């Protein structure tokens, strides 16, 4: 049986893109030094989570993978350290805008792109203003260390996401996430959120990160 060590990065994000990327790099290096082989960064870590307000100027934050500074930096870092890094970013593809993840293999190459399927829309998650529902479908990738599936944040509430990736042969499931509970409810939703993830892990007999 193969053993794979994974890490999940949690960090405070500011409005300074360069500062956020530098902080992410520092934490990836620390995780790699501790032996992690697959290192998950948070959802949309380049900026503060901007989806709580509708601002047309925020559309300018979207880029292609080739133009995205975080994707480029993490490609170089993955190749240097020999680690796999799923990188969340705001993607522009033609006239469409997506909440996406570039799965970067340990040689720095991009295995592929996943675009978030389930897009929330309420007072504090105005994501439908910013993102088109993804058109990639759920996917898995053979990386240097494991066959992995990647969803994004709100996808975690839906069991079919995890099940589809499990049936495609995923060995590990990753869900980069910006928010883990509802900020405006009187009752903390974090335990419900965590129980959903535990359910995905138990039902599909694999770790969920």
Please report, for each region that a protein language model flagged, where it lies by residue:
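Catalytic-core segment of enzymes that process non-peptidic bonds
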Residues: 60-150, 202-209
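Short polar catalytic/cofactor-binding loops
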Residues: 10-15
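Short glycine/proline- and charge-enriched loop/turn segments
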Residues: 52-61, 122-123, 183
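Active-site beta-strand/loop signature of hydrolases that rely on acidic residues for catalysis
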Residues: 6, 20, 28-57, 78, ...
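CN hydrolase (nitrilase-like) catalytic-core segments centered on the catalytic cysteine
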Residues: 63-84, 153-209
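Beta-strand-turn-beta hairpins that frame and shape the catalytic cleft
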Residues: 1-6, 140-149, 172
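Amphipathic, non-transmembrane alpha-helical secondary structure
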Residues: 18-32, 72, 159-163, 167
């Amino acid at each position: 049986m193969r053993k794979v060590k994974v890490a999940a990065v949690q960090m405070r994000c500011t409005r300074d893109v360069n500062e956020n990327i530098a902080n992410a790099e520092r934490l990836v290096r620390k995780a790699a030094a501790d032996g992690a082989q697959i290192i998950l960064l948070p959802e949309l870590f380049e900026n503060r989570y901007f989806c709580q307000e509708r601002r047309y100027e925020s559309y300018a934050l979207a880029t292609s993978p080739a133009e995205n500074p975080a994707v480029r930096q993490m490609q170089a870092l993955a190749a240097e350290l020999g680690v796999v890094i799923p990188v969340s970013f705001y993607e522009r593809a033609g006239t469409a805008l997506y909440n996406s993840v570039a799965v970067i293999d340990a040689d720095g190459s991009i295995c592929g792109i996943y675009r978030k399927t389930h897009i929330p829309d309420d007072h504090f998650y105005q994501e439908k203003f910013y993102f088109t529902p993804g058109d990639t479908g759920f996917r898995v990738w053979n990386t240097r260390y494991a066959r992995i599936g990647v969803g994004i944040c709100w996808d975690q509430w839906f069991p079919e996401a995890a099940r589809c990736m499990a049936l495609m042969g995923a060995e590990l499931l990753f869900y980069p996430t910006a928010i883990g509970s509802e900020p405006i409810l009187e009752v903390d939703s974090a335990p419900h959120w965590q129980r959903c993830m535990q359910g995905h892990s138990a039902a599909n007999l694999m770790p969920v990160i």
